[in-house]
């Protein structure tokens, strides 16, 4: 009997296995969304997507955090027709229309209202404990940033005006306990969170809830935004995903996603910045864009900015060039960036 076999036999834990054969490394489910640059932000690859583990979407109010969470959860449920969403709700700001917008059948959503961190902790751990690895479940928490601790609520009931030092500790415990379950049972958890500005001459956004979230999360996004204007009229927003932490993507990467009032998320937004930087597209004249033949240098038909948001503009680039590899090298950990991504292209 080899040393490996002896150690494996002596282990008291049922999931012990050789690393190269471990299902926790070789059978990781990764579900793509319909938005290529969201897949890049999650995994570093256009063909990647939402993976098991904790993903935190943080930002100020009205920064599309819940919608990003539902977009990912909707993709998971579309990919797995038998999947169920476990939706923990402390904000009650997601009407039925939000779910329908992302193709989510609300009869497959278990809605659990919560009022404090301890309620969330006890219920979530209880649910995860009873699930099997083959159960297809996606968990969404909206939001942890708005959750009080049980002590804070009790103090308010008893008219005590004292500082609450237990909330960060409770959140740290919640994610410390849930992280192994998410990995071992192949479950993605998407948590919406808030940010605050640190004090200083050059303040930066800080994810609320303490350091426990940073330790446990596989992905942390801090979401910013710019107005999408036509003249003086606001048509929507250019949201910028700032990758604060990732197991797959280079930290501090900035990925823009455009959302309009009328059409919702522009699926192919964010790609133009990369294509221009890598030479897969050019700007032949002000306000016009075109694809470029990589072998001959021939410039394709010119289109306006709106035309670059159409599938027809990108299909030839993905099919006939190495643009996917370029994006992977640009954003994924373990590769050297090929170009500097400073500019975010917006409609002129």
Regions found by a protein language model. Name each.
Residues 2-108, 126:
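The Walker A/P-loop phosphate-binding site
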Residues 53-57, 137-141, 187-189:
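Generic beta-sheet signal
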Residues 55-57, 86-88, 110-112, 190, ...:
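Hydrophobic/aromatic beta-strand patches that form the interior of the parallel beta-sheet core
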Residues 60, 71-72, 76-173, 177, ...:
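Conserved inter-motif catalytic segment of the P-loop NTP-binding fold
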């Amino acid at each position: 009997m080899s040393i490996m076999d002896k150690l494996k036999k002596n282990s008291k834990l049922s999931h012990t296995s050789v690393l190269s054969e471990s299902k926790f490394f070789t059978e990781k489910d990764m579900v793509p969304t319909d938005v290529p640059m969201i897949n890049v932000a999650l995994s570093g690859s256009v063909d990647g997507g939402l993976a098991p583990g904790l993903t935190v979407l943080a930002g100020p109010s009205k920064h599309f955090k819940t919608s990003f969470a539902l977009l990912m959860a909707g993709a998971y449920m579309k990919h797995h027709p038998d999947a169920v969403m476990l939706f923990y709700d402390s904000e009650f700001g997601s009407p039925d229309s939000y779910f329908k917008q992302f193709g989510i059948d609300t009869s497959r959503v278990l809605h659990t209202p919560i009022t404090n961190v301890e309620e969330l902790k006890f219920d979530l751990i209880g649910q995860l404990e009873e699930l099997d690895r083959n159960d297809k479940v996606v968990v969404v928490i909206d939001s942890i940033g708005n959750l009080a601790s049980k002590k804070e609520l009790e103090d308010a009931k008893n008219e005590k005006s004292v500082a609450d030092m237990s909330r960060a500790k409770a959140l740290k415990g919640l994610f410390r306990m849930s992280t192994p379950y998410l990995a071992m049972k192949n479950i993605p958890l998407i948590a919406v969170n808030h940010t605050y500005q640190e004090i200083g001459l050059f303040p930066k956004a800080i994810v609320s809830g303490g350091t426990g979230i940073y330790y446990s999360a596989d992905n942390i996004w801090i979401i910013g935004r710019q107005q999408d204007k036509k003249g003086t009229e606001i048509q929507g927003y250019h949201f910028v995903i700032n990758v604060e932490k990732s197991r797959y993507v280079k930290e501090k990467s900035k990925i823009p996603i455009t959302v309009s009032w009328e059409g919702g998320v522009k699926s192919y937004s964010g790609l133009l910045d990369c294509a221009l930087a890598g030479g897969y597209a050019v700007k032949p004249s002000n306000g016009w864009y075109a694809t470029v033949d990589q072998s001959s240098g021939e410039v394709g038909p010119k289109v306006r900015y709106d035309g670059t948001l159409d599938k027809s503009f990108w299909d030839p680039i993905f099919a006939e060039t190495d643009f996917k590899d370029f994006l992977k090298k640009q954003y994924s950990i373990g590769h050297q960036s090929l170009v500097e991504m400073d500019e975010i292209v917006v409609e002129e």
